[in-house]
Amino acid sequence: RPCLLDVTLYPYSRAEANAWMIFPYEIVNGARTTARLIQPAEMAQRFPLCLAYLTARRAELERRNIVGGSAATRQFYQFGRSQSLTKFNSPKIILPILSREARYAYDDNNIMMTGGGNGPYYLIRPREGAPETNFFLMAVLHHPLSEAIVRTHTSSFRGGYYSHGKQFIEHLPIPSATPAERADIEALVAQLIAANDAAQAARVPHQRILHERHAAALRDQVEGRVSRLFGLSAADIALAKAVPIPA
């Protein structure tokens, strides 16, 4: 499966995998979505080279502390923890736990990554049945008010980095919005991500500058829409932006 390995994520960007991860599971959709560990006999038939690769590293893999799975199905190559394996298979927001600004990227390609503790990555997606979408949440999370709240409560690290871990973002306020207001913001965020994609792909400096200007204008529009939902004035926004990076 495609995965992230020490990749820098950018605001309103699309996450791009730079490596591959062996995922020895099959996602089974039923009344409850589960991740079924592929057993050795099946792996030998379907993915013989993968099994050979894992077997060559068996001694190293067996030194890990394995949690999860029944005794009958547990294998030396299963992941150390398995409680979130099914959550990768859906559109989601990916963020670096440690950063010096809001950096929430979008993924709709089922990218894998490691996480937990101080990262390096964390995933967000709307609760099932919630009216908010990933794009709407990205707009709120990137807003200066949200980042000001994070900076006020976060843990700081060397180099000016501070945590955007679960405990610092899970209680951020989400403004009420009508379906039309949410749709408007979602459309702008989709355009903003596309503009950043175009800027990243541009090979001619002039084209890149044009796309970057377009992205900046779209970001201002998104910020303005969310500010209105929060009922914030220009002075309120200036105050939020003035909150310093924690020392």
List the predicted regions and their residue ranges.
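Polybasic, glycine- and aromatic-enriched phosphate-binding surface used to engage nucleic acids
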Residues: 1-187
